[in-house]
Amino acid sequence: MCGNNMSAPMPAVVPAARKATAAVIFLHGLGDTGHGWAEAFAGIKSSHIKYICPHAPVMPVTLNMSMMMPSWFDIIGLSPDSQEDESGIKQAAETVKALIDQEVKNGIPSNRIILGGFSQGGALSLYTALTTQQKLAGVTALSCWLPLRASFSQGPINSANRDISVLQCHGDCDPLVPLMFGSLTVERLKGLVNPANVTFKVYEGMMHSSCQQEMMDVKYFIDKLLPPID
């Protein structure tokens, strides 16, 4: 990867305390790194699960006056009708699929992997889960939206994850990605995957961030879908 400006440092990893039989891949938000989320998962970890928090490559972001910062894809605007970086989103999804493949090579089947993320990372996790042929255990999407929503059919998706479990979380005081985005996204998701498996949790007073209750809800979701198998 030397000389490629898309390269990013190795992910922050919280290793399993014993043999890893499941994994969580969690994607941070715009301008962040995986380190803070790795610390958060270290606080709610289970001994058989490996938690992988990759770092986005650094690129110019149109929304922020083309300043260079860690970003999974370019963000042009934050309104519902903003133009989207279609090629960048699709390329980023391929990067995430490669991370999933790497864990499968390490001996963890894809249906023992949960994909998740916060804000831009959550958006990418939803898009990847809905477009990959890798069957996943679930998605945990925090304070985010569904990118390229017009590219999805009106009916259920015809892919491996039409019955996937989704935990979507949002703060009701989010000034950056308004709660309405989360509400619209969850309604769209219920048309794309089995609606019985979609859970939407709203946290009173929470802004564009996380909170202790949300992390406990994430832990419960992960531990329920990825129980120990030995």
From Swiss-Prot:
Pfam families: Abhydrolase_2 (PF02230). Belongs to the AB hydrolase superfamily. AB hydrolase 2 family. The active site is at residues 119, 174, 208. It is found in: Cytoplasm; Cell membrane; Nucleus membrane; Endoplasmic reticulum. Gene3D superfamilies: alpha/beta hydrolase. It comes from Rattus norvegicus. One of its GO terms (biological process) is protein depalmitoylation. This is Acyl-protein thioesterase 1. Keywords: Acetylation, Cell membrane, Cytoplasm, Endoplasmic reticulum, Fatty acid metabolism, Hydrolase, Lipid metabolism, Membrane, Nucleus. Acts as an acyl-protein thioesterase. Hydrolyzes fatty acids from S-acylated cysteine residues in proteins such as trimeric G alpha proteins or HRAS. Acts as a palmitoyl thioesterase that catalyzes depalmitoylation of proteins, such as ADRB2, KCNMA1 and SQSTM1. Acts as a negative regulator of autophagy by mediating palmitoylation of SQSTM1, decreasing affinity between SQSTM1 and ATG8 proteins and recruitment of ubiquitinated cargo proteins to autophagosomes. Acts as a lysophospholipase and hydrolyzes lysophosphatidylcholine (lyso-PC). GO terms for cellular component: cytoplasm; cytosol; endoplasmic reticulum; mitochondrion; nuclear membrane; plasma membrane. Homodimer. The keyword Acetylation applies. Ubiquitous. Detected at low levels in all tissues tested. Its main location: cytoplasm. The modification N6-acetyllysine is found at residue 224.
